[in-house]
């Protein structure tokens, strides 16, 4: 499907959970001849990341309102109006055929600016419960898509766009069949690390002994303290790294993952075909719980919420999963994934642009 001469503006910012899926869709459409620009904020990760991917970025000034106090709330209408005006000027100059909102605060004024100019708005909600910005924008959007069922009552479920190297992994029955020895446990707390996992997993390792081998991503600045915790637990043999640059290789190595349940993490684990023990971040919307729930319902994962998290709870769960059980869970995870999510989102953008 050629997009020769068509123009897209992607609105996404703040976190990797918004930016990476946007980049996947952008690259897919650029390969079809689309021109793509990005709308973001200068002080968040998209400012550095997006230009590295060969995409020009325009900035507006906007930030979140939650927990900012009464003065910020009083000033909010003026700040939103100014951001809307900036976004409107950018879009009048660029003249996109369609804008794609992938979440983050930038999508709010950006979506309103597009709507006020008669430019169709396409939305993608990555989480199992809709963010505030997308809830507002859904009322004016031409098309609303969601990664997990339930964020919007009638939106099409298309999954989350996932990195191509994760999608390229061999199927779990090819990867995991015939594996022997200690169960390989990959521990991932997100790029910031998760203090609760850093504190809990060394003690879990002590309980499970040589039945497991662990690769633990500690997050920035925590590697030394986590290595020390494993050593003090009598388990110095496990591997601790601040970051894992090649997540596809880590997924290929693992038999099971212990992690938070950010939207992109859940989608990647399903696409990789891996069983998981999810410890959702305690957010007032329980966003990460709802992200993980479809995989638990599919028999591919278990959720332990943070108040119930203990060394025994994690150790007993991992000890109770035989290799046969892990393979069955891995196959269920893969079956629950939507590997063509990028194409599905891109096709809707193309369809709306042609309408």
From Swiss-Prot:
Pfam families with a match to the protein in the record: Glyco_tran_28_C, Glyco_transf_28
Residues reported to bind UDP-N-acetyl-alpha-D-glucosamine: 15-17, 127, 163, 191, 244, 263-268, 288
GO biological process: carbohydrate metabolic process; cell division; cell wall organization; lipid glycosylation; peptidoglycan biosynthetic process; regulation of cell shape
Recorded GO CC terms: plasma membrane
Gene3D superfamilies with a match to the protein in the record: Glycogen Phosphorylase B
CDD domains: GT28_MurG (cd03785)
Domain of life the protein comes from: Bacteria
Catalytic activity: di-trans,octa-cis-undecaprenyl diphospho-N-acetyl-alpha-D-muramoyl-L-alanyl-D-glutamyl-meso-2,6-diaminopimeloyl-D-alanyl-D-alanine + UDP-N-acetyl-alpha-D-glucosamine = di-trans,octa-cis-undecaprenyl diphospho-[N-acetyl-alpha-D-glucosaminyl-(1->4)]-N-acetyl-alpha-D-muramoyl-L-alanyl-D-glutamyl-meso-2,6-diaminopimeloyl-D-alanyl-D-alanine + UDP + H(+)
Subcellular location, record wording: Cell inner membrane
Gene Ontology MF terms: UDP-N-acetyl-D-glucosamine:N-acetylmuramoyl-L-alanyl-D-glutamyl-meso-2,6-diaminopimelyl-D-alanyl-D-alanine-diphosphoundecaprenol 4-beta-N-acetylglucosaminlytransferase activity; undecaprenyldiphospho-muramoylpentapeptide beta-N-acetylglucosaminyltransferase activity
Signal peptide feature range: none
Membrane topology note: Peripheral membrane protein
Group of enzyme by EC: transferase
Pathway(s) annotated for this protein in UniProt: Cell wall biogenesis; peptidoglycan biosynthesis
EC number from the UniProt entry: 2.4.1.227
UniProt entry keywords in alphabetical sequence: Cell cycle, Cell division, Cell inner membrane, Cell membrane, Cell shape, Cell wall biogenesis/degradation, Glycosyltransferase, Membrane, Peptidoglycan synthesis, Transferase
Family assignment from sequence similarity: Belongs to the glycosyltransferase 28 family. MurG subfamily.
Record's function text: Cell wall formation. Catalyzes the transfer of a GlcNAc subunit on undecaprenyl-pyrophosphoryl-MurNAc-pentapeptide (lipid intermediate I) to form undecaprenyl-pyrophosphoryl-MurNAc-(pentapeptide)GlcNAc (lipid intermediate II).
Record-given protein name: UDP-N-acetylglucosamine--N-acetylmuramyl-(pentapeptide) pyrophosphoryl-undecaprenol N-acetylglucosamine transferase
UniProt source species: Escherichia coli O9:H4 (strain HS)
Organism ancestry: Bacteria, Pseudomonadati, Pseudomonadota, Gammaproteobacteria, Enterobacterales
